[in-house]
Each structure stands twice: as C-alpha cells, then as structure tokens.
Regions:
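Juxtamembrane "helix-exit" motif on the non-cytosolic side of transmembrane helices
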Residues: 61-70, 123-136, 186-197
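Membrane-helix boundary/juxtamembrane motif in polytopic membrane proteins
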Residues: 41-44, 104-114, 135-143, 156-180
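Aromatic-anchored segments of alpha-helical transmembrane domains
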Residues: 55-60, 115-128, 178-188
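C-terminal transmembrane-bundle signature of multipass membrane proteins
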Residues: 152-239
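Transmembrane helix-loop junctions in multipass membrane proteins, especially transporters and channels
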Residues: 34, 38-41, 67-71, 95-102, ...
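Membrane-helix boundary elements
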Residues: 1-6, 114-141
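Individual alpha-helical transmembrane segments in multi-pass integral membrane proteins
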Residues: 10-26, 43-114, 142-146, 197-220
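First transmembrane helix
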Residues: 6-38, 141-162, 223
Length: 239
C-alpha cells in the first residue's frame, strides 16, 4: 500500500472526480432500472438496481477514502463488501432474467434472501471484528477483483447468447458496455498485481466508457418506451 500512498498527491483530484462521476452514473442507472420492478412487482427485476446501487455506493466510499474524510481501516471493508456484492447481484439478476416459473421464483427468493443474509453478516463482522493486517486487505482486494471479473464475464457470455441480440440494437450496446467493464476489471487486476500505471488509468477510462454506454442505452430505452406510450395514448385507433 505504501506505493499507493506515495502517489496520492499526484492523482487524488482526478481519482476522486472519477469515483464521484462513477457513483453518480450508477445511481442514475438505479433510477432507470428500478422502474420495471415498480411496474411489474417481479422480484427478478430488483437485482439490477441493487447491483448498480451497491456499485455506486462502493465508488462513493472509494471517493471518501481518497479524500481522507474517514478512517481507511474501517471504510475499505465496506468498499470491498459493496463492490463484491454489486457484481454478484448483477450476475444473479441476469441468471434469473428469463420468464419466471413457479420453481424459478422460489429459487430466486432463496438466493436473494441468502445473499442479504451473507451481506448483513459481512457488514456486522466489519463492526465487531478487530482490525485486520494490511496483508489481509491486499488478499481480499485481489479476491474481490477476481470475483468481479468472473461475474462480469458471466454477464457478457449471457448477453452474447441471448437470441434477441440480433434483433435488438440496444442489446449490442449493452454487450459493449459489459465488455468495457470486463476490460476495466481486468486492468484493475493487473494494477493490483504489479502497480502498472497504464493498467491503473486503463481501469478508470474503461469504467467511465462502460458506464457512459450503459447510461446512453438505458436512457434511450426508457425515452423510446415512454415516447411510444405517449403516441399510443394520443392515437385514437389504439384506444
């Protein structure tokens, strides 16, 4: 960690700015992605907003960490917990994204409840456990990066195998977004392994590009859906 601390004065402003922008982008995505759940009440739709909500929270915590507004020893655990669970929730959401059956709803409820039990336990342990050595942070940090990459890779493959990707132009851009996010996560693993500054900046650039694409696609889908609904209401033939 000493290498990171030594370079903080050089990049703290752009890093905090990027973390803040990333957090805001994720929270905007949550605003859009919560709508299908609000309309249908289907539990399978809650995974995406939860995933991006936790991801945004992890970026916000990261920004706070670099501004030194809170104790690093405590807050880094929350960052790792939220970052790990964000990608797990996203992967689970895509796994259960197909039209639900009675059995799949039951399995989803069990998995969803189990994830929240594990999340609550992890947060509780963060408060009651003694301070962990720096080596533990490095191990957990690397593990979370690997887990995140595995989850993103699964989402990418899942999107790639969807039959609607050829007909839906937006699906292709979602695939691009997750591809960029996978590159970002891979670069972060390289950065954690050998402190390559090229990998470090690649991580941030790919992340911003990914979130930008997701924002554009999500807004376009929401805007077109809303616009189409207004046209249907105005067209007397469709009343």
């Amino acid at each position: 960690m000493s290498e990171i601390i030594d370079v903080i004065p050089y990049y703290i402003i752009p890093r905090v700015s990027i973390e803040t922008i990333s957090a805001v982008a994720c929270f905007i995505l949550v605003k859009f992605m919560i709508k299908p759940y609000q309309v249908t009440g289907e539990g399978r739709y809650i995974g995406l907003p939860l995933g991006f909500g936790f991801l945004g929270a992890s970026y916000a915590i990261s920004a706070i960490t670099y501004t030194e507004l809170a104790s690093f020893e405590l807050i880094w655990r929350f960052e790792l917990i939220f970052r790990a669970f964000s990608f797990v929730f996203l992967a689970v959401a895509y796994y259960f994204s197909k039209k639900p059956s009675k059995n799949s709803r039951c399995i989803w409820n069990i998995v969803f409840s189990g994830l929240f039990v594990i999340l609550s336990t992890a947060v509780l342990v963060t408060f009651v456990a003694p301070q962990l050595p720096q080596s533990s942070y490095q191990i957990l940090n690397f593990f979370v990066r690997i887990l995140s990459l595995i989850c993103i890779a699964y989402i990418f493959v899942h999107c790639l195998r969807e039959k609607t990707i050829a007909q839906d132009p937006y699906a292709k851009w979602v695939l691009v977004a997750y591809g960029l996010l996978a590159l970002s996560q891979y670069s972060s693993i390289v950065w954690a392994a050998d402190f390559s500054y090229f990998a470090f900046w690649s991580t941030l650039i790919f992340r911003l590009m990914s979130l930008g694409v997701l924002l554009a696609v999500t807004y376009k889908i929401f805007f077109c859906t809303k616009k189409g609904r207004v046209k249907d209401e105005e067209d007397p033939k469709k009343r």
